Amino acid sequence: RLKEHVGCQDQVIAAYGGFNRVDFWGEGQFRTSPIMITWERLNELQDHLMLFFTGLSRTASDIAAEQVSVSPQKARELRVMHQMVDEAINILKSPHGLGDFGKLLDEGWQLKRSLTGRISTPYIDELYERARRGGCTGGKLIGAGGGGFLLLFAPPEAQAGVAAALDGLLQVPFRFES
């Protein structure tokens, strides 16, 4: 048993692999369900994603502990965030464009930021706003918050503008695997 407050999402995702929905409940209880979309749709999603290292590191357990402590007061926000999972999956499975996925990411990021003041920092907020002005429509920090990697959603034709807006940050190439 870990003696730190850390989420187990990363561990479950790494252990199971694939493109899955993971639902958590109770102490260490979870269920994984594959998200069934075509390889073409997954590539379309991939083509809209950009990953940047913020240059900041943080202690995830401190941020996670604060999130746990405020969870009862933030039940509405957490419920909305949970409902957004179904909406995201519906967007991915629909035959329409992915534009709404970026908007949903932005909405989710704003909700997550409202959970605790330690999710973001003025520097992260500035980076996110620069990316938005550059053409991204949504994004989020990967992990507990406070630093690490910024995942952004931008149409392929806007990605040069996003990269220019975040000049000086390391863009990390990545690909989904089959």
Question: Where are the model-predicted features located?
Answer:
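C-terminal nucleotide
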Residues: 2-5, 9-140, 151-178
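Glycine-rich active-site/cofactor-binding loop and its immediate structural neighborhood
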Residues: 147
